[in-house]
Amino acid sequence: MRIAVTRERGVGERRVAISPEAAKVLVAAGHDVVVESGAGSAAGMDDADYGSAGATIAPDRAATIGSEGLVVSVQGPTDSDALAGFTEDHVVVGLLDPVWNPEAATSVAATGATSYSLDLVPRSTRAQSMDVLSSTATVAGTQAVLTAAYRLPKLMPLMITAAGTIPPARLVVLGAGVAGLQAIATARRLGAVVEGFDIREEALEQIRSVGAKS
């Protein structure tokens, strides 16, 4: 199978759909992996890394997607330039977000291409190997707290000094999904007093399990 890896064009998007390590596995399995030049640069993976893995480096997007095959990306195509070249012989896989951004999925469908949105894969043991959303949410939950700690005008942990005691910061995390639970765990490790809130009754025990009040 021909597998195309396109460069992400979203503002601030630094991810790439397939790493050189994954490309090497796919090539070894007999697939033809084509990577758009610069696709992994923002993630610290250059064209030489992909070339060493056996992938072909294409100079632009048109040459990358070709006339048929599987096209993988993190975010789905969002404009006419990104949609150009898709045909009924293409299969698009990525985080297309059809619930909140139905126009993107509709635009892909209008080209005749088949699309699969990985953000709709259920969180189940059977589908765990395809659950890219949970890994992304884990990173987001961690980074959210680190950013908050940087911007917070006080220290996170309790500090007892000769000059006095500094009470710990108090954080409230709304939502106890993957990102929320990771945010709670990160804040607890930084020494904050954390409370979690979720409308789901079953989430209360999960909130307590990572050390927060519910």
Question: What positions do the PLM features span?
Answer:
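A broad detector of short, well-ordered amphipathic alpha-helices
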Residues: 66, 139-142, 146, 181, ...
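Short, hinge-like loop/turn segments at secondary-structure boundaries
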Residues: 50-54, 132-136, 211-214
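Glycine-rich phosphate/diphosphate-binding loop of Rossmann-like nucleotide-binding domains
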Residues: 6-42, 154-214
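Short Asp/Glu-rich motifs
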Residues: 44-46, 69, 126-128, 206-207
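Acidic active-site catalytic centers that drive phospho-/nucleotidyl reactions
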Residues: 69, 119, 198
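Short linear motifs at secondary-structure transitions and domain/linker junctions
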Residues: 7-10, 46-49, 65-71, 122, ...
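Glycine/serine-rich phosphate-binding loop and adjoining beta1-alpha1 elements at the start
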Residues: 2, 8, 81-170
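An N-terminal-biased, well-structured beta-alpha scaffold segment characteristic
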Residues: 5-107, 111
